């Protein structure tokens, strides 16, 4: 009798977890996703408001990132783990107590690891839900692009640089600081993979805007002229709601014939693939720069017939990068050895 009750309870639990008719699909991955993301969110908000200063450079000069220490929404951040910790895994039980753990930035690792595992689980949950519904797996493939970006920035880059103190601070101003320092140290703007990522993101935005405007402009009229086109649409209807041939003809004449798609599947695959591939490349670029395989440096690359270099915009950019680099962690650097 007891085993029967346990069997029924387990079956009911499995049915609840894996049912695709729930208002919110849970899934087996969801058992990991929701606790992990909840812990990361609570820890982040708490640290953003209340965390003490963190000795990010490992030189006993702590940096405050929480609101209680006078920061605002723009300047506030969860400060990365101390350079004294390096790339060591630093849970609470590895410290002498909570005060030391907070001082060394243990909160940063806590938030980053729980968040990253949570979004990886979310990607698995997307695959699982698609599988339950008999759908193809392209949704989770597309979501792999931001997962790859998160892995590159939060995991691979700090490991490649030898310390989680080089990770991106979890705040608005901290993000921009990370970007400027990344450019100064790695010449990311001159890296081909970053250029492909920019083309992917901005190109994807352009293509999405073009597609949305074309669809909205070629809706099939099912109503009288005095009525809204929306009144002729029934949610979930099998009939097409817009004329792809009309949109194709318009765009083909606006640009040239072969610039448009006359196949809906090809069109939407292109809209999905373009930004995803671009972000994949950017993530790969950040992962390579983590190990100092940097972007191009054209400093002093133009020479006259006597062998003297001629200043160019590349030299101006290089000088700006050097200025940013010596301003960064200025108390930890030994000027001018950092410029060598």
Swiss-Prot record:
<comment type="subunit">
    <text>PSII is composed of 1 copy each of membrane proteins PsbA, PsbB, PsbC, PsbD, PsbE, PsbF, PsbH, PsbI, PsbJ, PsbK, PsbL, PsbM, PsbT, PsbX, PsbY, PsbZ, Psb30/Ycf12, at least 3 peripheral proteins of the oxygen-evolving complex and a large number of cofactors. It forms dimeric complexes.</text>
</comment>
<feature type="site" description="Stabilizes free radical intermediate">
    <location>
        <position position="186"/>
    </location>
</feature>
<dbReference type="Pfam" id="PF00124">
    <property type="entry name" value="Photo_RC"/>
</dbReference>
<feature type="transmembrane region" description="Helical">
    <location>
        <begin position="138"/>
        <end position="152"/>
    </location>
</feature>
<feature type="binding site">
    <location>
        <position position="340"/>
    </location>
    <ligand>
        <name>[CaMn4O5] cluster</name>
    </ligand>
</feature>
<comment type="function">
    <text>Photosystem II (PSII) is a light-driven water:plastoquinone oxidoreductase that uses light energy to abstract electrons from H(2)O, generating O(2) and a proton gradient subsequently used for ATP formation. It consists of a core antenna complex that captures photons, and an electron transfer chain that converts photonic excitation into a charge separation. The D1/D2 (PsbA/PsbD) reaction center heterodimer binds P680, the primary electron donor of PSII as well as several subsequent electron acceptors.</text>
</comment>
<feature type="binding site">
    <location>
        <begin position="260"/>
        <end position="261"/>
    </location>
    <ligand>
        <name>a quinone</name>
    </ligand>
</feature>
<dbReference type="GO" id="GO:0016682">
    <property type="term" value="F:oxidoreductase activity, acting on diphenols and related substances as donors, oxygen as acceptor"/>
</dbReference>
<keyword id="KW-0150">Chloroplast</keyword>
<keyword id="KW-1133">Transmembrane helix</keyword>
<dbReference type="GO" id="GO:0009772">
    <property type="term" value="P:photosynthetic electron transport in photosystem II"/>
</dbReference>
<keyword id="KW-0472">Membrane</keyword>
<feature type="binding site">
    <location>
        <position position="185"/>
    </location>
    <ligand>
        <name>[CaMn4O5] cluster</name>
    </ligand>
</feature>
<keyword id="KW-0602">Photosynthesis</keyword>
<feature type="site" description="Tyrosine radical intermediate">
    <location>
        <position position="157"/>
    </location>
</feature>
<dbReference type="InterPro" id="IPR055266">
    <property type="entry name" value="D1/D2"/>
</dbReference>
<keyword id="KW-0148">Chlorophyll</keyword>
<keyword id="KW-0464">Manganese</keyword>
<keyword id="KW-0812">Transmembrane</keyword>
<feature type="binding site">
    <location>
        <position position="166"/>
    </location>
    <ligand>
        <name>[CaMn4O5] cluster</name>
    </ligand>
</feature>
<feature type="binding site">
    <location>
        <position position="268"/>
    </location>
    <ligand>
        <name>Fe cation</name>
    </ligand>
</feature>
<keyword id="KW-0813">Transport</keyword>
<dbReference type="InterPro" id="IPR036854">
    <property type="entry name" value="Photo_II_D1/D2_sf"/>
</dbReference>
<dbReference type="GO" id="GO:0009523">
    <property type="term" value="C:photosystem II"/>
</dbReference>
<keyword id="KW-0934">Plastid</keyword>
<feature type="transmembrane region" description="Helical">
    <location>
        <begin position="193"/>
        <end position="214"/>
    </location>
</feature>
<keyword id="KW-0106">Calcium</keyword>
<keyword id="KW-0793">Thylakoid</keyword>
<dbReference type="GO" id="GO:0045156">
    <property type="term" value="F:electron transporter, transferring electrons within the cyclic electron transport pathway of photosynthesis activity"/>
</dbReference>
<keyword id="KW-0460">Magnesium</keyword>
<keyword id="KW-0604">Photosystem II</keyword>
<dbReference type="InterPro" id="IPR005867">
    <property type="entry name" value="PSII_D1"/>
</dbReference>
<keyword id="KW-0408">Iron</keyword>
<dbReference type="InterPro" id="IPR000484">
    <property type="entry name" value="Photo_RC_L/M"/>
</dbReference>
<feature type="binding site">
    <location>
        <position position="211"/>
    </location>
    <ligand>
        <name>Fe cation</name>
    </ligand>
</feature>
<feature type="binding site">
    <location>
        <position position="122"/>
    </location>
    <ligand>
        <name>pheophytin a</name>
    </ligand>
</feature>
<feature type="binding site" description="axial binding residue">
    <location>
        <position position="114"/>
    </location>
    <ligand>
        <name>chlorophyll a ChlzD1</name>
    </ligand>
</feature>
<dbReference type="GO" id="GO:0009635">
    <property type="term" value="P:response to herbicide"/>
</dbReference>
<feature type="binding site">
    <location>
        <position position="329"/>
    </location>
    <ligand>
        <name>[CaMn4O5] cluster</name>
    </ligand>
</feature>
<feature type="transmembrane region" description="Helical">
    <location>
        <begin position="114"/>
        <end position="129"/>
    </location>
</feature>
<dbReference type="GO" id="GO:0016168">
    <property type="term" value="F:chlorophyll binding"/>
</dbReference>
<feature type="binding site">
    <location>
        <position position="338"/>
    </location>
    <ligand>
        <name>[CaMn4O5] cluster</name>
    </ligand>
</feature>
């Amino acid at each position: 009798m007891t085993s029967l009750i346990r069997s029924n309870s387990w079956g009911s639990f499995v049915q609840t977890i894996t049912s695709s008719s729930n208002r919110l699909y849970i899934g087996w991955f969801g058992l990991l996703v929701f606790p992990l993301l909840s812990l990361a969110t609570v820890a982040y908000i708490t640290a953003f408001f209340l965390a003490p200063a963190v000795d990010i450079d490992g030189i006993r000069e702590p940096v405050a990132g929480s609101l209680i220490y006078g920061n605002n929404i723009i300047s506030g951040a969860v400060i990365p783990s101390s350079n004294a910790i390096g790339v060591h895994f630093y849970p609470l039980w590895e410290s002498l107590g909570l005060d030391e753990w907070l001082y060394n930035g243990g909160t940063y690792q806590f938030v980053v690891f729980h968040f990253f595992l949570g979004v990886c689980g979310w990607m698995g949950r997307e695959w699982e839900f698609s599988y339950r519904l008999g759908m193809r797996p392209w949704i989770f493939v597309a979501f792999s692009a931001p997962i790859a970006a998160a892995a590159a920035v939060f995991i691979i880059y700090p490991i490649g640089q030898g310390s989680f103190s080089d990770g991106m601070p979890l705040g608005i101003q901290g993000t921009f600081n990370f970007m400027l320092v990344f450019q100064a140290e790695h010449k990311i703007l001159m890296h081909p993979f970053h250029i492909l990522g920019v083309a992917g993101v901005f190109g994807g935005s352009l293509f999405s805007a073009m597609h949305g405007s074309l669809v909205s402009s070629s809706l099939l009229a099912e109503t009288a002229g005095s009525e809204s086109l929306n009144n002729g649409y029934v949610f979930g209807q099998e009939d097409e709601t817009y004329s792809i041939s009309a949109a194709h003809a318009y765009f083909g004449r606006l640009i040239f014939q072969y610039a448009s798609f006359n196949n809906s599947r090809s069109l939407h695959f292109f809209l999905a693939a373009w930004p995803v591939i671009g972000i994949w490349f950017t993530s790969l670029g950040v992962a390579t720069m983590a190990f100092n395989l940097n972007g191009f440096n054209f400093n002093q690359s133009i020479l006259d017939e006597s062998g003297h270099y001629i200043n160019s915009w590349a030299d101006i950019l290089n000088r700006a990068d050097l200025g940013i680099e010596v301003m960064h962690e200025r108390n930890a650097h030994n000027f001018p050895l950092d410029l060598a």
